[in-house]
Regions:
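Short gly/Ser/Thr-rich phosphate-binding loop of adenylate-forming enzymes
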Residues: 1
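A structured beta-alpha segment of the ubiquitous adenosine-cofactor-binding alpha/beta core
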Residues: 47
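AMP-binding/adenylate-forming catalytic core of the ANL superfamily
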Residues: 4, 20, 25, 30-31, ...
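Active-site glycine/GP-rich loop and adjacent strand/helix microenvironment
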Residues: 13-16, 30-34
Length: 167
């Protein structure tokens, strides 16, 4: 069997709270090949593996995916899901794909930068994207910076490689 726990700030979180999934069991891997630092970051000495997924557990023990921990943008004291921003803005018919990342702000936290790839033959601009964001997102979740790009980097599995967008 596999054990699962939802952790936040060093403790198991209560139902309804968002926390990180950790798993432990005989089929959980023992570490990354030739990457001891990464293994130490994600595999606790007692065998609990930190998956990097943030979820909320309800009273019936069902888990609801929130986002990947690496996709959290810290802005004005709030944890904001980059995936939520990407989904909301990416629904614009003239946007082929987009990706939000956190960039350093003068306040020591992060501002939201959104990289946007336009669909071929469209005339979308950062101003249009800003106006759309006002319709779709609360003020705290709206990108401060919008840059139009020809393409976004992807991983081998064709997911957007946000880590390659970081300045």
């Amino acid at each position: 069997g596999v054990e699962v726990r939802i952790m936040g700030e060093g403790r198991v979180v209560a139902p309804g709270e968002v926390g990180g999934i950790e798993v432990r069991g005989p089929n959980v891997f023992s570490g990354y090949w030739q990457m001891p630092e990464k293994t130490a970051e994600e595999l606790r000495p007692d065998g609990w593996f930190i998956t990097g997924d943030l979820v909320r557990r309800d009273d019936d023990e069902f888990l609801f995916f929130f986002t990947r921990k690496k996709d959290i943008i810290r802005r004005r004291g709030e944890n904001i899901s980059g995936a939520e921003i990407d989904s909301a803005i990416g629904s614009h018919p003239d946007i082929l794909e987009c990706a939000s990342i956190g960039v350093a702000s003068d306040l020591g936290e992060e501002e939201i930068l959104l990289a946007v790839v336009a669909r071929a033959g469209t005339q979308i601009t950062p101003e249009i994207v800003h106006a759309y964001a006002k319709q779709k997102l609360s003020p705290i979740k709206r990108p401060r910076y919008i840059v139009m790009v020809e393409s976004l980097p992807h991983t081998g599995s064709m997911k957007i490689a946000k880590f390659r967008l970081k300045p």
